[in-house]
Amino acid sequence: MKKRVVCLGLTLLLLLNAALVTALGNQGWYLVLRSADTGQTYGRYPMTEGDWFSVGFVHSVNKSPVIDCYEIKHHSIYVEKTIYYNFGAGVQTELEGNETLSYGKDGAMIVSGFDREMSDLTYFVGTVSDHTLIVNDGEEISLRNLCGRSSKVRFTYEWLWS
């Protein structure tokens, strides 16, 4: 009888331990994409300090690619650089503060040195051309497919329990 109680107790302890590992296994820091209008979660991607992500799109006026690059620092999202290929309305033409301009081998203009926290990072998903999220491992996610055309998408960096 005593053996049976001990075995039952150990079995329950192992089951409880497995349940805790499963429940806590998905907790951590995530890049979270939500509807800025409804709060609906579109997606979440695990990230840690020092990880990068970018959002690419085709500029609506000059019809060339633009890539905004962000880094996770101090548990926040920081814009670090922008890559673009043509000047046009809404494209930076002057450098400020510690910003620098360099050129890529493909002719890209790279403005870096922003190092600016983005407390409210929101994108409007294009109707004519898509916006693409690129996360750590190079995975490309179509924001049009994930969120829908004309969606207003808010990016946050959050601790999530599950």
Describe each model-derived feature in a short phrase.
Residues 7-24:
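Hydrophobic membrane-insertion alpha-helices, especially the h-region
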Residues 10, 14, 31-32, 36:
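Hydrophobic alpha-helical targeting segments used for export or membrane insertion
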Residues 34-83:
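N-terminal secretory signal peptides
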Residues 20-35:
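Aromatic-capped interface at the extracytoplasmic side
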Residues 1-4:
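Positively charged n-region of N-terminal signal peptides that target proteins for export
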Residues 61-62, 85-87, 117-118:
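Short, surface-exposed beta-strand-loop junctions and turns on beta-sheet-rich folds
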Residues 28-30, 52, 67, 130, ...:
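Exposed beta-strand and adjacent loop surfaces of beta-rich binding modules
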Residues 80-81, 90-162:
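Mature, soluble, non-transmembrane domains
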